């Protein structure tokens, strides 16, 4: 995998930094594992904007990725690595011995021809999925379940991983990248290793149009608006003279947003401040 800085042949190319992976498949994706993906433009079923700064962008198909990894005891061979426009990580197309193909998240170091397996008896190596009670303490894992059988929810983006730091009875304690320490049932599954494509964070889009290709619209500062549009709007100069708030007057920048008290008991230590 290489980091390529483009030559300044035009203003739009001057700052572009690309991540080039020659191992990625250059053809079309595997059609039976594709689904139609409609654009919402950030609107809900009433046509109201529920998420700002979304709209346009290139058409995409959704890749049906197997986050459950529940095909136990059947070895699979990695056929190829592919780009997935719906996530920062790359995905791998695997062929199981019984003839079924599935997409999985491509962990670091996985390449075409490698063999992977799921289940209690799987070997301790990157790409294999086991219940966390069978994974040694200190291991780094990704695609971690929070409820047994629900499928992986933690550590799924490029370069992400979670470390198993303790095992106590029916629970394991995980250290997340944010610094949070959290308890999860030991029967929950996780995939060994960390997610590949960690260089994704080094890319530079280089121009506004590259964001538009991805369906991201401009974000206008509140202080650049009029008073009718935003609490920070209007006035002489750039000072808005109050605590930062959202367009609807709710405090931002540091305000706590977590409201799921039911699972507070599973958080051993809160995430560390940056």
Swiss-Prot record:
What Gene Ontology cellular-component terms does the record carry? Answer: large ribosomal subunit
The record's annotation in Pfam families points to: Ribosomal_L2, Ribosomal_L2_C
Gene3D superfamilies, sorted: 2.30.30.30, Nucleic acid-binding proteins, Ribosomal protein L2, domain 3
Q: Which UniProt keywords apply?
A: Ribonucleoprotein, Ribosomal protein, RNA-binding, rRNA-binding
| Entry-linked SMART domains | Ribosomal_L2, Ribosomal_L2_C
Sequence segments annotated as region (Disordered): 221-274
Q: Which GO terms describe its biological process?
A: cytoplasmic translation
Task: Supply the InterPro entries for this chain.
Answer: NA-bd_OB-fold, Rib_uL2_dom2, Ribosomal_uL2, Ribosomal_uL2_bac/org-type, Ribosomal_uL2_C, Ribosomal_uL2_CS, Ribosomal_uL2_dom3, Ribosomal_uL2_RNA-bd_dom
Q: List the disulfide bonds.
A: none
Q: How does it assemble?
A: Part of the 50S ribosomal subunit. Forms a bridge to the 30S subunit in the 70S ribosome.
Say which family it is in: Belongs to the universal ribosomal protein uL2 family.
Q: What is this protein called?
A: Large ribosomal subunit protein uL2
Q: Lineage of the native species?
A: Bacteria, Pseudomonadati, Pseudomonadota, Gammaproteobacteria, Enterobacterales
What is the gene name? rplB
């Amino acid at each position: 995998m290489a980091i390529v800085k483009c030559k300044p042949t035009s203003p739009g190319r001057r700052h572009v930094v690309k991540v080039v992976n020659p191992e990625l498949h250059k053809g079309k994706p595997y059609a039976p594992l594709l689904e139609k993906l409609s654009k919402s433009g950030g609107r809900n079923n009433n046509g109201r904007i529920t998420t700002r700064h979304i709209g346009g962008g290139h058409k995409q198909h959704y890749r049906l990725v197997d986050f459950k990894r529940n095909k136990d005891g059947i070895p699979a061979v990695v056929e190829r690595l592919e780009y997935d426009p719906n996530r920062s990580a790359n995905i791998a197309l695997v062929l199981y011995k019984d003839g079924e193909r599935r997409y999985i998240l491509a962990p670091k170091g996985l390449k075409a021809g490698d063999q992977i397996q799921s289940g209690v008896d799987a070997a301790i190596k990157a790409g294999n999925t086991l219940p966390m009670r069978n994974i040694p303490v200190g291991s780094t894992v990704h695609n971690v379940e929070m409820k047994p059988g629900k499928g992986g929810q933690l550590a799924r983006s490029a370069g992400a991983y979670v470390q198993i730091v303790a095992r106590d009875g029916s629970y394991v304690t995980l250290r997340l990248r944010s610094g949070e320490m959290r308890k999860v049932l030991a029967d929950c599954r996780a995939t060994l290793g960390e997610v590949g494509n960690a260089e994704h964070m080094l890319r530079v889009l280089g121009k506004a149009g590259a964001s538009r290709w991805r369906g991201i619209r401009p974000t206008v500062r509140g202080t650049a608006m009029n008073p009718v549009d935003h609490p920070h709007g209007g006035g002489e100069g750039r000072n808005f003279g109050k605590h930062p708030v959202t367009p609807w007057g709710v405090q931002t920048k540091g305000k706590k947003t977590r409201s799921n008290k039911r699972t507070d008991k599973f958080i051993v230590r809160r995430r560390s401040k940056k």
